[in-house]
Each structure stands twice: as C-alpha cells, then as structure tokens.
UniProtKB/Swiss-Prot annotation:
GO terms for cellular component: mitochondrial membrane; proton-transporting ATP synthase complex. This is ATP synthase protein 8. It comes from the Eukaryota. Belongs to the ATPase protein 8 family. The chain crosses the membrane at residues 12-32. The gene is ATP8. PANTHER family: ATP SYNTHASE PROTEIN 8.
Amino acid sequence: MPQLVPFYFTNLLTFGMLAISMLLYLVSTIILPNILRLLVARTTMTKL
C-alpha cells in the first residue's frame, strides 16, 4: 500500500492538494454561478 510508505507522502500530499484546489476553483467559478443564476431565474419567474 503506497499510502503507508513514507517515500510517497510528499507526492500524495502535493497532488492531493493540487486536485482539491483545482476542483474548488472549478466549482466556485463555473458550477456555483450557473446554479445561482438558475435559482434566481426560477424565483423571479414564480414571483411574476
């Protein structure tokens, strides 16, 4: 199991942090604004 070998700790931590930061960036810039735009459009349509 490479997770328990100390040689792989830095590699796993580096790419883990890289993957998490890329995922967080994509979610905050692409996915959440689209969902927010959809929710605002739905609430304004129902209030009309």
